[in-house]
Amino acid sequence: VPCCILNPADSFRFPVFLLVGAPRCCTTALSRYLTRNPQICFSRPKEPHYFVRTDYIPGIDELKRDYLDRCFAHCTLSHRALGEGSVSYLYAPGVIERILHFNPKAKFIVQLRNPLKMLPSYHLRMQFLLQEDQVDFETAWALQAERKRGEHIPKRCLDPRLLYYSEVAKFGVQIERLFELAGREQTQVIIFDDFASDTLGTYQRILEFLDVDYDGQTDFERRFGSQMYRYLWLQKLLFVPATSNGKVVGTLQQRLRKYNPDGSKKSTWTQRLTRLNKVPRSPQPLSPQMADSLREALRPDIQHLSGLLGRDLSHWVDK
């Protein structure tokens, strides 16, 4: 139950669990399976990214207006567990603390995969979202230091931290921080290989973690792949960043434009054009040299993650 700073009318709508990452680790599929369980109510949109848009703890009125009323309006007292799935929460600083401020008993689900497979997919996703203007992943990786100094930031990028690829992939650091803040008993870490090989068993373990009954679900399709645009120039015309006093603001306002106050999804001509402009696209394979460079860069963190989980994941960074 969320902490007492929220009144009972609002506290039931604060999420009991959060699927916090990692990006491009099949969290969309997992959230879809959880949404189909009648005892679970998932936020609309799936990824509000509410707690990364500010560096402070929001007031109660602000939280209610911009988060609870907008993302969980469709949830009722009949739902046993409310959740959301913002994958930025795992690596963005200060987010877990802000969540725990409102619900000290919040549960966190993390799904991880080999970062050498995750990073190219994540880079392509950033291009799809018009946050990244470098088509070549090796170039984007090499620009990290300069981007941390505020250089070479794409003009449509809502948050430069999205482009700090090495930070996004530091799973060991992220899991250690999550364990320290929330505790191991409030955290469930899933390895993608387990999820892929035994989806039903993984799903049932998650329901047990959430204290939710199994709903008999057995069809666990995974139909979502990477996408890009037929005409990038068209998508740039359709995408107009939300601004405040001339400055680009967080992604929540962008996402909420797509939803009605009751949580139902709008349909506009720009969204219809966007759907027509999408095409399947696979990430470019890593060159042998880039793969070796990533292995060396990520090996210490993966060793650290292995120790935290009591599971050898060295094959992720071994040749």
Predicted features along the sequence, with ranges:
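Non-transmembrane alpha-helical segments in soluble domains
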Residues: 31-35, 52, 100, 120, ...
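PAPS-dependent sulfotransferase catalytic domain
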Residues: 61-76, 132-219, 240, 245
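Alpha-helical packing segments of well-folded alpha/beta enzyme cores
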Residues: 67-70, 95, 171-175, 202, ...
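Conserved glycine-rich "GG(E/T)P / GGGxP" loop and the immediately following alpha-helix
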Residues: 86-90, 95, 197
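Short aromatic-enriched loop/helix-cap "lid" or pocket-rim segments at secondary-structure transitions
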Residues: 95, 119-124, 130-131, 201-203, ...
